[in-house]
Amino acid sequence: GNGFTRKSGKAVLIGGGIGIPPMLALAKALKEEGAEVSVVLGYRDGDLFLKKEFEPYADVYVSTEDGSVGTRGNVIDAIRENGLDADTIYACGPMPMLRGVKAYAAEKETEAQISLEERMACGIGACLGCVCNSTDVDSHSHVHNKRVCKDGPVFNAEDVTL
């Protein structure tokens, strides 16, 4: 599969729920490479995890659905409230969050890389259990599909239909 392509400049990393832990190593690597890193972590409530672990590598912002900590609402609400901008957005989390990230990135004309969370039965692309819709046609199969296990799990947001 493919991971995040690290780029220099301003980076906003967005993690929601179980998509938060994968962003920690990326935050560390980007910081070590000289990027200006901000992290937005989305939680349901004030039961925060990994926030302190991100702090050495990034400015950390939090959104909670219940408003108990940080911005009340979702990660996009937190980005807008804090006036964050980026050369590249990196995101991992639930599908509704990724849809919001994709729409926000398109609105701001900013590159976004998203990591899809899909069940992967075989892990080698044979079973097609992890297929997602893509915006381009595969030259071999002539369909609009990508295998998350082989072609992803990270995609440019504009390359997939969520």
Predicted features, each with a name:
Residues 1-119:
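FNR/FR-type flavoprotein reductase catalytic core
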Residues 22, 95, 118-153:
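Local cysteine-cluster metal-coordination motifs and their immediate loop/turn environment
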Residues 50, 71, 145, 151, ...:
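Glycine-rich, flexible loop/turn motifs
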Residues 142, 157-162:
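SAM-dependent methyltransferases
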